[in-house]
Every structure is written in structure tokens, then in C-alpha cells.
A protein has these predicted regions:
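Conserved, well-ordered active-site substructure
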Residues: 116
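Glycine-rich phosphate-binding active-site loops on the catalytic face of alpha/beta enzymes
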Residues: 120-121
Length: 163
């Protein structure tokens, strides 16, 4: 599967030191230029993991052109989210968009763009046997400052219990 990511899920993976999950789940990982800039500006303990992933397997790609209807749907989003959604839509083959921000997810759904967030990616990793349990990772990433709502965590608990 080809993945296009916004900044947030990549920062979450860096906080967990789990970029290898993304590398193993995706055939290719792309980010737009604005997401690249946001990742390069990240400091702290996860900066080295981000830098390694950028050099090893994450590719930068410029999004395609946008029509006025799409522009209206993307209005109000930050530039990284806009570019990530546009980049995901520019591929001719199916692409999974990694995006955790609620407003961005709402816009992507309006455009019928398949998407998941960090929790969904961790659930997929569990499904294919790359990790045993999702909940400790969710708790760990939240403890390290990655914001996930209680509702999202509750949904992950339900989904993980069914797997």
C-alpha cells in the first residue's frame, strides 16, 4: 500500500520509535514539502528518528493541481494538511492518507479519500502480527505528549478487543 502522511502521525511514530512499522506496512511513503518542513523543524528526543526516516524511506513529492471544489473543502486547514490531502489525491493508484487532525479527516472524507491515523496504523500493525498489543503504545504516545482524544482511545480499545 502507498501511504501519504501528514506531520502528526509521523511525529507519533517517532515518539514511539516505531517507524519500522510504517516501513513494513507501506510499499512507499510520501510526504508533501510543507510536511517535510514541519518535520525538519521538530526538535526533542524524536528528531533523530524523524531524520533517519526522512533519509531512509520517506519520499518528498509535490502535490498535483487542485480544482475549486476541492479548494473550498480544504479551506481552513493548515498548509501541511492541505498538501497531504492533495498529494494523496494526485496518485492514480489507491493511496492511504495518514492524518489525525479532526478537521483534516473531515475534509478528506468529503473527498472520499481513504485514511487512517496513528491509532489505525497501530491496529493494522497488530492485525498483521507486527505488534502484540496496541493499547500500551497508545498510552505511551499520549504520555509523551501526542494528543489523542479520550473518544479515540476508547474506540481503539473496542477495536483492539475485537481483533
Amino acid at each position: 500500500m502507498i501511504v501519504v502522511s501528514n506531520t502528526g502521525p509521523l511525529i507519533g511514530l517517532a515518539k514511539l520509535n516505531q517507524f519500522e512499522l510504517l516501513r513494513r506496512l507501506a510499499s512507499a511513503v510520501y510526504i508533501p514539502p510543507q510536511v517535510h518542513r514541519e518535520l525538519l523543524a521538530k526538535s526533542g528526543p524524536e528528531a533523530a528518528a524523524i531524520d533517519n526516516a526522512l533519509h531512509e524511506f520517506i519520499q518528498i513529492k509535490i502535490p498535483g493541481a487542485v480544482d475549486s471544489a476541492t479548494t473550498d473543502i480544504l479551506k481552513g486547514l493548515d498548509e501541511g494538511e492541505k498538501q497531504a490531502i492533495l498529494l494523496a489525491r494526485s496518485f492514480s493508484s489507491p493511496v492511504l492518507l495518514l492524518l489525525d487532525d479532526r478537521a483534516g479527516r473531515t475534509a478528506a472524507r468529503k473527498l472520499n479519500q481513504p485514511l487512517t491515523g496513528l491509532p489505525g496504523l497501530l491496529l493494522k500493525a497488530k492485525d498483521v502480527g507486527l505488534i502484540k498489543d496496541v493499547l500500551p503504545m497508545i498510552e505511551d504516545v499520549r504520555a509523551k505528549g501526542y494528543w489523542l482524544s479520550d473518544a479515540v482511545v476508547d474506540a481503539v480499545k473496542v477495536a483492539a478487543a475485537k481483533r
